[in-house]
Amino acid sequence: MPTGQQPRLLVSITRLVAFVTVVTTGLLSEAQVPDGEWHAFGRDEANTKYSPLDHITADNFSDLEIAWRWTSLSRAVVEENERIRPSAFKSSPLMADGLVYVSTALGQAAALDAGTGEPVWTYDPRIYDDMERPPNMGWHHRGLSYWKDDQSDDARIFMSNHDLKLVALNARTGARYPDFGENGYVDLTQGYGRAIDASRMTYSSPVAVAGDTIITGSIVQDTNIRLREASPGDVRAYDARTGVMKWIFHTIPQGDEFGVDSWQNESWRYSGHTNVWSYMAVDEELGLVFLPTGTPSNDWYGGMRPGNNLFAESIVAVDIETGQRVWHFQAIHHGLWDWDFPTGPNLLDITVDGREIKAIAQVSKQAFT
């Protein structure tokens, strides 16, 4: 953490709403997203979901008309193959430098002219040719990530996908980068600290972008109630230019790591999940990425993993450069019933009684924010 920087605090927005002023301009300038553009699922890596544009108002909203329509790439595939049944369209479109970027439920991607909706490029790895149905939630995809190189004019689209690969695409042409990983791909089944069952894993959420570091979570199938052993939900970071893995954070501590004693009977050796399946948030000024973690294996019974089970159902602040835990907040000790965090945290600069606080607002399944 940079010297002299104030750490972020997890706060209850419901308790502060009467006397808190929320300030977003500082975060937006930090994120360096031009007005009118949308570079991440929440517009910026702080996940503010705030646009400074003021052209559309309550007075003129009813005058809006459809400018163009785009038919998803997945539609033609589904019409030709009855066995493929995608779920809801969950991708949040990005917009940068005049192009709109979107993914489909089948793991495809497209760049569209923002003014006309005409396709500029498309990307289709045809994962559906060799896969009946991705584990857990089936065919769905939550979106892409945009990265602009501060050392050149290079811009990339990153996509983690159902084929357990991370791909880097040229944002202007859609071409893969042959020097990223292996021919443009990073094999996400490699680099775990222990054995995994790849048949029960998938990737569909946008990766987090922090400077020249790309950080990815995962989806681990959690629908088998008899499951004890399971693949871990470790979070990993990669170099945005080369695809080389920088670090791994064990969401279930291993060996002598902090928190391993919260897994009694050495249950850390075989327990799994505790993954980040949703979105993360990044504060580059503090040098931290914030991980909203899930429930351990299995979701419904914890008799084989006594203890508080860190870092399950927690917000974990991790150093972007080293992958080391800085702090954590565990919402549920010894989690059951799948009460994990269903979305990424929102980073807020707030003022409480004249005191500026860097804060985190986290929506949960636990009836608290």
Predicted region positions:
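Intrinsically disordered, low-complexity Ser/Thr- and acidic-rich flexible linkers and loops
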Residues: 79-83
